């Protein structure tokens, strides 16, 4: 009979206070085992602080947190045997080769020399680093370093892997490689808790997502559930030229009776509408005024739009430097 807990993480009223401010303020999480669970939130929302508490790196000031049924405060050693942590900064040694780094990690985990070398070879090949196995880490690209860092965190395969913004600063090809690695880990039985500043990454990887702000969960569900939560369709259109946008915005506002949003593209407008027929009537009105529409679509809200509606911040309203500085502690 399988007695493996069905919940990888359970928190109730989790609190962490810094200098009188609640960085995490009564956080409740319920993370099923065997999937990718994403945590999204604006800068300073409490994401990294939450991970540090769950990984037993930081003691909570209130509430409870359990990992596979084990309390992070009273059973930290048991929790640590079940987890691994990796983030946007590599925890490997630049003065060693890729293979040497993984062998060292294996030895630190208690492997014999033979088993450590065997496991290092498995991971080097599995993560597509075979051609660089004997090169010093300082010669690796950012994407290669990130793959090696993740490999180092699973020398002993964890039941739960914390990935804290693992693809920040990577090019699209390297990000896709990391995504493939994450999917393979979950297929092999590892639960992944992912924080990311890229909403497309959460959309691609996460089976469920919690959006947190000011240290609390403000929404939770699958990406489909979150997108449906706005309860409306989104009309998006692009005009032939930017000079037409003000007039198109005026006409759409009068026809639809809703707020018209200006996108970053100077030719683009969008609006949330309840009835798709409203969108068709609005497009017909634009056509009658001879405003040329280059393209249009009518569909579900994007995760970016959900994030903006929930937090009041656009998803890209933060720099990489801000992400790196997030929730630093003294």
UniProtKB/Swiss-Prot annotation:
Compartmental location: Cell membrane
Name the record gives this protein: Daunorubicin resistance ATP-binding protein DrrA1
GO biological process: daunorubicin transport; doxorubicin transport; response to antibiotic
Species, as recorded: Streptomyces coeruleorubidus
Family: Belongs to the ABC transporter superfamily. Drug exporter-1 (DrugE1) (TC 3.A.1.105) family.
Domain ABC transporter: 9-239
Alphabetized InterPro entries for the sequence: AAA+_ATPase, ABC_transporter-like_ATP-bd, ABC_transporter-like_CS, ABC_transporter_ATP-binding, DrrA, DrrA1-3-like_C, P-loop_NTPase
Keyword terms: Antibiotic resistance, ATP-binding, Cell membrane, Membrane, Nucleotide-binding, Translocase, Transport
PROSITE patterns in alphabetical order: ABC_TRANSPORTER_1, ABC_TRANSPORTER_2
